[in-house]
Amino acid sequence: MKLVFAGTPEVAVPALDALIASGRHEVAAVVTRPDAPAGRGRRLVASPVAERAEEAGIEVLKPAKPRDPDFLERLREIAPDCCPVVAYGALLPRVALDVPARGWVNLHFSLLPAWRGAAPVQHALMAGDEITGASTFLIEEGLDSGPVYGTVTETVRPTDTSGDLLTRLAFAGAGLLAATMDGIEDGSLEAVPQPAEGVTLAPKITVEDARVDWTAPALRVDRVVRGCTPAPGAWTTFRGERLKLVQAVPLPDRSDLAPGQLAAGKNNVYVGTGSHAVELLWVQAQGKKPMRAADWARGARITEGERVGD
């Protein structure tokens, strides 16, 4: 089939690579978000998908909005059979959805209908899911509600961050998306409507969502830290400034600290929660680079009874 691939961040690149490598489909063009300012100099930088497409000699389209007339005209000229999508980053209007003969097919990083929305991996970790996965589905105008072509499952590991899990899902999902394109082309796949039961929502994680509540159980604190790493980053406050929690582990054998109470040893930093303590392994103080929590504690000269989160 002739394809136009839509995607923007690094997590979409494995799927683009899989489609290019398949040899069965022609990736005629790529649609991605416009170049965005990055770094200290705020220099405009192309998206990872745009860079990969340019390396492969594929035409790159960067509409400010997917309803732009010039973009729609070019899309109609290309006349794709199908448009696979991975983390494109903009809502597709009906006028765009109607262009490809076989629609737009999205790779979503959850087992639909669970975790519909912008942050499925983060929400799966924060909810304590033991199994998650990826789904391919036909895009409709509802939120991730279209009929599903296929799924792949992935076991959540005890130390997974959202970054770890998303990386694995990106590669597993790439194979799923390529197989979905094959099945659509040869007629062996039929999309199945999502069940009405089991729908959960995964809205974008806000900065406030990532703030650690030290009165919550240690297991919840652990899930928030892992679910919000690397972005937006779990955090608390210390002496009136924000402190990012990069890595922490629950300690079920220690329960002598009040919620938020700090205890610093030579090589360890502990914080009390609503159940037992957690050990902080890596933190990032405001305006600093990530560092070992023990090094941070020595520099901060933590005194007995000090707390985080006040």
Swiss-Prot record:
Its EC number is 2.1.2.9. (6S)-5,6,7,8-tetrahydrofolate binds at residues 110-113. It is an enzyme of class 2 (transferase). It comes from the Bacteria. The keyword tRNA-binding does not apply. Gene3D superfamilies: 3.40.50.12230. InterPro entries: Fmt (IPR005794), Formyl_trans_C (IPR005793), Formyl_transf_N (IPR002376), Formyl_transf_N_sf (IPR036477), Formyl_transferase-like_C_sf (IPR011034), Met-tRNA-FMT_C (IPR044135), Met-tRNA-FMT_N (IPR041711). One of its GO terms (molecular function) is methionyl-tRNA formyltransferase activity. Keywords: Protein biosynthesis, Transferase. It holds the Pfam family Formyl_trans_C. GO terms for cellular component: cytosol. NCBIfam families: fmt (TIGR00460). Belongs to the Fmt family. This is Methionyl-tRNA formyltransferase. It comes from Streptomyces coelicolor (strain ATCC BAA-471 / A3(2) / M145).
